Curated annotation (Swiss-Prot):
Lineage: Eukaryota, Viridiplantae, Streptophyta, Embryophyta, Tracheophyta
Protein family membership: Belongs to the PP2C family.
Binding site for Mn(2+) 2: D158, D321, D360
Superkingdom: Eukaryota
Protein name: Probable protein phosphatase 2C 55
Any GO BP annotation: signal transduction
Signal peptide positions on this chain: none
Binding site for Mn(2+) 1: D158, G159
UniProt region (Disordered), positions on chain: 1-59, 79-115
CDD domains assigned to the protein according to its UniProt record, in alphabetical order: PP2Cc
Start-end of Basic residues biased regions: 92-104
InterPro entries membership: PP2C, PP2C_BS, PPM-type-like_dom_sf, PPM-type_phosphatase-like_dom
Amino acid sequence: MRRHHLLGLLRRAAASSTSAASSRAGPHPSLHAPGPLRNGGSAPRFFSSRGGAGAASKGLGDDEVELYSLLLGVSIGDEGEASSRGPAASRGGRRGRNSKRQPPRSRFDGDGVGCSKDGKLSWGYSSFQGRRPSMEDRLSIKSTTVNGETVSLFGVFDGHGGPRAAEYLKKHLFKNLVKHPKFLKDTKLAINQTFLKTDADFLQSISSDRYRDDGSTAVAAILIGNRLYVANVGDSRAVALKAGKAVPLSEDHKPNKKDERKRIEDAGGIVVSDDIWRVDGILAVSRAFGNRLMKRYVKAEPNIQEKVVDEGLEYLVLATDGLWDVMRNEDAVSLLKAQDGPKAAAMKLTEVARSRLTLDNVTCIVLQFHHGKSTNSK
């Protein structure tokens, strides 16, 4: 898409908030104001869309709505409350050689907020592109009911070699998981099998060698009643604030770890370092979705932790490595304590990552557990 055409679409989107609504459903109706959903149902009463993509998309054609969805890279489930801010325009020019170093600017950033129907959980998310030439992070949020059980699912996906794998996970991972026949009875088994099957499905969907290097990490939180499951592949990370302390709930999959290196080498791969340890001198994570040429030893098998949600659990952060590259777990939870609600916390985390000159895309979701207190989803 040529730059002048892209700018034209954005200008039209900004100017069209009072136009008549398009007669055709956009590709992401769940980002719009309450109304008919793609599956034929109606948006629940607690679903709301305030401003941003929801308001600006009124009167847009399919291509403009698709543009908003692509820029934000956000998937919100049919039964989740969310609002999102539209993509920000590029700000600032190229930094001169002798100019003062400035934090990287983000061409496309988005943020949003939501809460569960029972009021026990609220969440906020924030993301920005940073210095990378493209945005390869994606996230997915879904709040639904399975056999009468309230289920909330959250995922952050960090693409590499292109956005295709992360986009596929955003669309399919949780859809596949809730359909697993043992999702409620043996959730850990269901998560493990769904991750592996979704990886196989993605590889089958990319027939062209053009996408053979597309891959993605993933970190997901699945809440079923008072049981919390955290699953991760790669180096996107989950960190909880519990009883005032940082508690890691995921394990970074790095090729220099003794067990991971042995597994890779036993399968025929090599691990080498050029300041960063890499599989076959290419990939800086030892597990990932996609990466077809390395699939023998770069698996999508997740580490899974199961926890009981008790009153000590206050917050949970899911974030891509663009955040963790410049922030310790303890720094992240300290920032959470000073913020007013999960959206403010998510935005603060990404702002600090940008101020610390992270070189990568950054996306994070912050969950706040209320334990009978009034919900604050700011």
